[in-house]
């Protein structure tokens, strides 16, 4: 009745507990809980042939995000965490779900990612710098965290590496990000795909590491 899993066990363990429940299962089928995808970019559009036309149009990005939500739900994914989206998209999608305007998986947003100036995820054209906040130094990083929380972020995403073998953020900057996030009782994830970035992420206390090559 509550939409939650009531019990787990073999058929012989629980069959007498729910004698009035009717479940129609096709022959040779299996029931499993909803799947969880903790790393998506629900409004991602860069690899589309019409990316340049979409880049300046939040409406198009929103429609792409909605289609991706439906696709996820159709294959059994019932929870999504979106790790960096165009500004305003994540909180808008979440609000639409909560208000019943749209249907889709449970949804948690990081809003925009946080990156160094010119770092991973940034663009040369500032007019379309829509998926990250560029922040340098401990206090700029803290301010970027606060801005994302103001915009409605459930999680905070920091980007600390690209493809070179170093960490783009200093350890002090990463520690400032984690401290600020945890001070507000939120959790943070980090894009870390090099050894140095991963080591700094662990030392700093990030809650999850994204990609984690070489682990």
Identify the role of each PLM range.
Residues 64-90, 104-113, 153-163, 187, ...:
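Divalent metal-dependent hydrolysis catalytic cores, especially in the metallo-beta-lactamase
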Residues 30-96, 203-204:
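Metal-associated gating/positioning segment near the N- to mid-region
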């Amino acid at each position: 009745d509550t939409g939650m899993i009531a019990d787990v066990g073999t058929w012989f363990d629980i069959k007498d507990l729910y004698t009035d429940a009717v479940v129609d299962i096709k022959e040779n089928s299996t029931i499993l809980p909803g799947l969880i995808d903790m790393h998506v970019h629900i409004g991602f559009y860069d690899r589309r042939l019409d990316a340049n036309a979409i880049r300046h149009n939040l409406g198009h990005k929103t429609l792409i995000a909605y289609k991706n939500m439906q696709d996820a739900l159709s294959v059994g994914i019932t929870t999504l965490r979106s790790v960096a989206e165009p500004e305003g998209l994540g909180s808008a999608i979440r609000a639409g779900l909560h208000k019943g305007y749209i249907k889709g998986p449970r949804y948690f947003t990081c809003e925009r990612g946080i990156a160094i100036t010119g770092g991973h995820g940034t663009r040369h054209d500032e007019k379309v710098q829509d998926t990250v906040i560029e922040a340098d130094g401990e206090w700029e990083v803290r301010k970027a965290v606060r801005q994302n929380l103001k915009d409605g972020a459930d999680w905070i995403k920091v980007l600390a590496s690209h493809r070179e073998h170093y960490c783009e953020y200093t350890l002090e900057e990463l520690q400032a990000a984690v401290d600020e996030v945890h001070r507000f009782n939120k959790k943070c994830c980090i894009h870390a795909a090099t050894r140095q970035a991963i080591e700094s992420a662990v030392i700093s206390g990030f809650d999850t590491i994204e990609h984690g090559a070489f682990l």
